[in-house]
A protein has these predicted regions:
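A glycine-rich, hydrophobic loop/mini-helix early in the fold
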Residues: 35-67
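Acidic, metal-coordinating catalytic segment for phosphate/diphosphate chemistry
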Residues: 2-37, 43
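Histidine-centered active-site/metal-ligand motif
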Residues: 27, 33, 70, 114, ...
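A structural signal for short, well-ordered beta-strand segments
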Residues: 38, 67, 97, 118-120
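The catalytic Nudix box helix
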Residues: 48-49, 64-98
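Nudix hydrolase/Nudix homology domain
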Residues: 22, 61, 73, 102, ...
């Protein structure tokens, strides 16, 4: 597997930076590193999903949240999410931190995702202009449609999306009740 030249920020379980490592090496060794998942909703409350490019280093062709990646060492997860959303989906939307979680998942190509994943949300009615190197397709789904599809075909969604979907949904409901 080739290296990318990109680095990830290695962290401890308290999200304190303990160093950096080349991205593919961190995924081969399963080292805990900082990441983010950015969820975008339109004014109808629909979830913006992207289908990952088929040649991504893992989870190619699977559906996931609007944008996910790794912050650079000098930037916050929310700043990185805002930046990467523009790069991947051609959208500008300010990321708002929601929560974070740790997960570990091994893939069939011997890569391991072990991430402290910062979940951010944002709202936009702007239509995406996806970067074809990152994204094959996109779509908007209402919550009920998304839940039905995830129940019917969970294997079509990334592992991190399946892990945090319910918590994102619950936090959104809480935010809407307090608004």
């Amino acid at each position: 597997m080739r290296t990318t030249g990109e680095t990830v920020v290695l962290v401890n379980p308290q999200d304190q930076a303990i160093g950096t490592m080349e991205k593919m090496e961190a995924h081969r060794k399963g080292r805990l590193h900082r990441a983010f998942s950015f969820f975008i909703f339109n004014s109808k409350g629909e979830w913006l999903l992207q289908q990952r490019a088929h040649d991504k280093y893992h989870s190619g062709g699977l559906w996931t949240n609007a944008c996910c990646s790794h912050p650079r060492s000098e930037e916050s997860a929310a700043s990185a999410a805002t930046r990467r959303l523009q790069e991947e989906m051609g959208l500008y939307c300010q990321a708002k931190p929601l929560f974070h979680f740790i997960y570990r998942s091994e893939f069939s190509n011997d890569l391991i995702e072990h991430e402290l994943d910062h979940v951010c949300i944002g709202y936009s009615d702007q239509l995406p202009v996806p970067n074809p190197q990152e994204v094959v397709n996109y779509r908007y789904l209402a919550t009920a449609e998304l839940e039905a599809e995830m129940k019917r075909s969970p294997e079509n969604f990334t592992v991190w999306f399946r892990i945090c979907f319910q918590q994102v949904k619950d936090k959104l409901a809480t935010l809407q009740q307090t608004a």
